[in-house]
From Swiss-Prot:
Keyword annotations from UniProtKB, A to Z: Ribonucleoprotein, Ribosomal protein, RNA-binding, rRNA-binding
UniProt family annotation: Belongs to the universal ribosomal protein uL23 family.
Gene3D superfamilies from the UniProt entry: 3.30.70.330
Job of this protein: Binds to 23S rRNA. One of the proteins that surrounds the polypeptide exit tunnel on the outside of the ribosome.
NCBIfam families: PRK14548.1, uL23_arch
Keyword Ribosomal protein appears in the UniProt entry: yes
Name this protein carries in UniProt: Large ribosomal subunit protein uL23
GO BP of this protein: translation
One CC-aspect GO term: ribonucleoprotein complex
UniProt KW Zinc keyword: no
Subunit composition and interactions: Part of the 50S ribosomal subunit. Contacts protein L29.
Organism: Methanococcus maripaludis (strain DSM 14266 / JCM 13030 / NBRC 101832 / S2 / LL)
GO molecular function: rRNA binding; structural constituent of ribosome
Amino acid sequence: MDAFDVIKTPIVSEKTMKLIEEENRLVFYVERKATKADVRAAIKELFDAEVADINTSITPKGKKKAYITLKDEYNAGEVAASLGIY
């Protein structure tokens, strides 16, 4: 699966801004069929960042969210800034 097909869009809200600042986490809508391994590979390819942990959930509307915790060497704020959301 192509990295651009896996990662659909970042989620920007007060909650996600708090996660970026305090927990070094990013939140994206991802392709519903994408596995955690697909998401990990897409983050590595698109942002050159190593992933420490991924949690996923499917919303009642059927969209899949990925909560991505980056390793300590990487800053979620810098990745968010490169996306233009922070």
